[in-house]
A protein has these predicted regions:
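N-terminal leader/targeting and accessory segments in enzymes
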Residues: 1-101
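Phosphate-binding loop of NTP-binding sites
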Residues: 7-10, 97-158
Length: 158
């Protein structure tokens, strides 16, 4: 797959590099980094994943999605200047949103292929949702159910 194909829904600024780059996976866990991965650096309440950028670059990742400038992290990595020029860096306002959009693109926008039915009310929601699921399955449709009694996908109940 080509990174550019994953970027259609994403609002980003290309800091450096080439979005016509081969990609295989989008990650946010630096321990899963490697060639072909897009690392999305998110700032959390305890950890700022931007600090793991030298690690993901060492592991072979060459595509970074960041929320802020990463000059210090690039200086800290063990790549020579020529290799650093090969890194593609995308800046976004919200890394979590970027991760969601990149993941959706990676898997072919599965939500666009789903029909969602919501049931609200005071009484009868569980009965109604199970009836809808039964009718859909009788019509040959695949149906899942998420409710207060659990999650049902096909015959699997959690």
């Amino acid at each position: 797959m080509i990174l550019q194909d994953w970027l259609k829904e994403l609002d980003y600024t290309l800091i450096q590099g080439n979005p016509d780059t081969q990609v295989e996976e989008v990650i946010y866990d630096s321990r899963k980094a490697g060639p072909g991965t897009v690392f999305v650096a998110m700032t959390g309440t305890r950890i700022d994943a931007h600090c793991f950028i030298p690690d993901v670059l060492k592991a072979g990742t060459r595509i970074l999605v960041t929320e802020r400038p990463i000059d210090m992290e690039l200086e800290a990595c063990e790549l020579d200047e020529e290799e650093k020029k090969k890194i593609t860096i995308l800046r976004v306002k919200d890394s979590r949103r970027a991760l969601a959009l990149l993941s959706a693109a990676r898997f072919g926008y599965p939500a666009k292929k789903l029909t969602l039915i919501g049931v609200t009310g005071t009484k009868g929601k569980t009965t109604t949702t199970h009836m809808i699921k039964t009718v859909l399955e009788a019509a040959g449709k695949k149906a899942g159910l998420i409710g207060t009694t659990g999650v049902v996908i096909g015959e699997h109940v959690t």
